[in-house]
Amino acid sequence: MTSYSLFWMSLLKNNWKPISNDFVICLWTLAVTFIRIYWIFFVPLEWKKDLDNEKWSFLRKTENVVCYNHKRDTINRLRKLKIQKIIELPPPYPNGWYGILKSSQLKAGEATCVSCLGEDLVIFRSKKDIVFILDAYCPHLGANLGIGGSVADDCVICPFHQWKFRGTDGLCINIPYSTSVPKGSKLKKWISQEVDGFIFIWYHAEQTELPWDLPVPMGEIDDTFVYHGHNEFYINCHIQEIPENGADIAHFNAIHKKNFINGSWAQKKRLFGLGSHHWKARWSPFTGKLKYLAEVNLSHTFKLFGKFGCFRMEVSGKQIGPSIVCLEVNSYTFGKIKVFQYITPIEPMLQKVVHEFYGPRWIAPLMKIFIYGESLMFERDIKIWNHKVFNRNPILAKEDASIKKFRLWFSQFYSSNSKIYSEATNIGW
C-alpha cells in the first residue's frame, strides 16, 4: 500500500463522523419545501367531476322513491324524469363551434376517437401538424378508425383491413388487397380549427352554412401568461341552460353570495361568517355581422364581516356562439386572469364543461385558490342544473328582462333542420 493511500485512510479514520439526525431532518425539510414550491408555481391544478361524483343520496330523504343499490340507477332515474318534459326542450345540438379536444392530447401521427354532438368522430394529426376530423366508422365493415387506426401523411388507416382515407376530403384512396376502390367509399369530413390549445369542430344542421371564423387568439394570450390548470364537469341539462346563467342576473347573489368556504352547496349552514360575495352583472348581445357574439360584465366585491369591501374584481367576457365563453378578470388581488369555458354536448341531456385558466407565473399560489373557489362556485350551479327542467315559456319578473333577450339571441343557433330531442335519440334499424 502506498504512502498516498495510507494518508487518505488515516484522514478519513480521524475525521469521519456519522451524519447527524439534525442534518438528515434538514435535508428532508429542504426537499419537501422545494417540492411544495415547485408544485405551487409549476404544476397546474386539475379538477374533474362527473355525474358519479354528485351526492345524490340526499334525494332519497326528500322523494318517495324506491331506493336503488347503485348510484348510477339513481342518476338514470332522474335523467328519465327530466326527459318526460321533452316537448319543452329546444334542439339539443345548436349550430356553432365546439371545443372537443385539447391540442396536447393529440400528438403528430396519432389518431383518437371522440364522441360528441350525437356523432362518433376520428380526430388525427398529420406529421406536418395538421388536424383532420372525419366520421369514425369505416364504410367497409364498420371499424372505428379512432381506436387502433394509424396515420400516414394526411391520411388515417383503418385498423381492420387497412383501408386508407384522406383527411382533406374523406375519400378512400387505397385498399392494399384490391386493385380498385369501390364507388362511394368516403367518410364525412368535418370543418375544424385549432385555437388557443384546443381543437374545435364546426357543427351545423344545414351542412351548407359557412362557419364564422373563431377569433385567433380568442383571448389574446401573450407570452406573460401561462397555463395554471383547468376543471372539467359533466352536467345533466340542456346546453342552453349553461350560458343562460350569464344573463340570469338575479342568480348571482342568490347562489354565489355565500362565502366559497361554505362549499359547493351554498344552502348548507356553516360556521364561517367571515364574509360574503356581492355581484353586479350586465348581459347584452351584439348585432349585425357579429350577432353570434354576446357580452357579459361582472363586478365582484367580497364584504368582510358584511362591512369591509375587499377582493374586488371586474370581469368582462364574450360569449362566442352557443358553447364558448372567454373571460378576462382584472383584480388588485389576482392581477389579470384569462378564463376560457368550452361546452360540448355529449348527448342531448349530457354536457361536458371545461374551464381553462391562464395568468402570470408569479400569481401561481393565488391561482390555486382562485381555481378552487371558482370550481366550488360552479358546482353550486351544477346542483341546480342536474335537478331542474327546462321551461320553454317561463314566468319572468320585469328584472329578468335579460333572460328574454338571451333566449331570443340564442335562438339564432337553431335552424329548420336542427334535430329535435326525439330525432337526436332515435335508434332505428
Swiss-Prot record:
Keywords: 2Fe-2S, Cholesterol metabolism, Iron, Iron-sulfur, Lipid metabolism, Membrane, Metal-binding, Oxidoreductase, Steroid metabolism, Sterol metabolism, Transmembrane, Transmembrane helix
Catalytic activity as recorded in UniProt: cholesterol + NADPH + O2 + H(+) = 7-dehydrocholesterol + NADP(+) + 2 H2O; cholesterol + NADH + O2 + H(+) = 7-dehydrocholesterol + NAD(+) + 2 H2O
E.C. number(s) listed in UniProt: 1.14.19.21
CDD domains: Rieske_RO_Alpha_N
GO terms for biological process, alphabetical: cholesterol metabolic process; ecdysteroid biosynthetic process; instar larval development; metamorphosis; multicellular organism growth
Transmembrane parts of this sequence: 23-43
Major localisation: membrane
Pathway membership: Steroid hormone biosynthesis; dafachronic acid biosynthesis
Membrane-protein topology: Single-pass membrane protein
Summary of the knockout phenotype: RNAi animals show apparent growth arrest in body size compared with control animal, also loss of nvd-Dm function prevents larval growth prior to the initiation of the molting process.
Cofactor field: [2Fe-2S] cluster
Location within or outside the cell: Membrane
GO CC terms, sorted: cytoplasm; membrane
Domain spans labelled Rieske: 98-201
Range of residues in the leader sequence: none
Organs and tissues of expression: Expressed predominantly in the prothoracic gland and weakly in brain and malpighian tubules.
Keyword Zinc included in the entry's annotation: no
Family annotation (InterPro entries): Cholesterol_7-desaturase, KshA-like_C, Rieske_2Fe-2S, Rieske_2Fe-2S_sf
Function: Catalyzes the production of 7-dehydrocholesterol (7-DHC or cholesta-5,7-dien-3beta-ol) by inserting a double bond (desaturating) at the C7-C8 single bond of cholesterol. Essential regulator of steroid biosynthesis, as this reaction is the first step in the synthesis of the steroid hormone Delta(7)-dafachronic acid. Required for insect molting, metamorphosis and body growth throughout development via the regulation of ecdysteroid biosynthesis in the prothoracic gland.
The family this protein is said to belong to: Belongs to the cholesterol 7-desaturase family.
Other information: Nvd_Dm plays a pivotal role in larval development in Drosophila. On this basis of the prolonged first instar larval phenotype, the gene was named 'neverland', which is the fictional island featured in J. M. Barrie's play Peter Pan, where children cease to age.
The protein, known as: Cholesterol 7-desaturase nvd
Organism in which the protein naturally occurs: Drosophila melanogaster (Fruit fly)
